[in-house]
A protein has these predicted regions:
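Bacterial N-terminal signal peptides that target proteins for export
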Residues: 1-9
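Bacterial N-terminal signal peptides
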Residues: 10-19
Length: 206
């Protein structure tokens, strides 16, 4: 039991260290290509919290449950981090769809190459937010390119060197699976839950 807890602690600390560096704009001395499908993760899988649970395709044969951002914000959170190798259970096995949400921030995580996004129920910049992520995995290549192209239409550049807070929130739709992260520095001050949609794909509306 003690060794399992020690492994969890070490993994969480490693993940936290990489996330803090990534969020502070560190590129680890590597210039990543602009093509999001060619981004190469620098963070080792072992340092990624619950890596196997996050990196999976969204089931295409599972009808999505319609929810809102406010529903995710209300989901109960575990008081202690789940084990670093915890498989998906319960709510995490479901697919969810958000027909109406707003994109507030987006960037490419310099450690694992996932596209990080913060969404809210309203366009208000102070509204509570939820993190959603589109993974680096090859099956999400077209989804990542779509995000990049749609943001470009709004004069916002997204690649491994560019991103951040949007000048104004953009309406979007989201399809993804619930994922319970752990409490660490992982976004803006408006992020109000450790629950995410990860993996997730988005469609930014005109």
């Amino acid at each position: 039991m003690k060794s399992r807890y020690r492994l969890l602690l070490i993994g969480a600390l490693l993940a936290l260290s990489f996330r803090m560096l990534a969020c502070s704009g560190q590129d680890f001395g590597v210039l990543q290509p602009e093509d999001l499908c060619k981004c190469l993760p620098i963070e080792p899988d072992i340092a990624d919290y619950r890596h196997a649970a996050k990196h999976m395709p969204i089931p295409s044969n599972m009808p999505p449950v319609e929810i809102m951002v406010t529903d995710i914000l209300a989901w109960p959170q575990d008081p202690l981090p789940l084990p670093i190798d915890q498989p998906r259970t319960g709510r995490e096995l479901q697919v969810f769809h958000l027909a109406n949400a707003f994109l507030q921030e987006t960037s490419v995580n310099s450690a694992d190459c996932d596209v990080h996004m913060e969404i809210s129920q309203t366009a208000d910049k102070n509204a509570p937010r939820v993190i959603i992520e589109t993974p680096v995995d090859s099956e999400f290549c077209s989804a990542r390119q779509q995000i990049q192209a749609q943001l470009k239409q709004h004069n916002f550049r997204l690649d491994s060197q560019h991103g951040g807070e949007l000048p104004a929130a953009l309406p979007l739709q989201v399809l993804g699976m619930a994922f319970e992260d752990f409490d660490h520095s992982r976004g803006s001050a408006q992020v109000a839950t450790i629950w995410e949609l990860h993996p997730a794909t988005v469609n930014i509306l005109p």
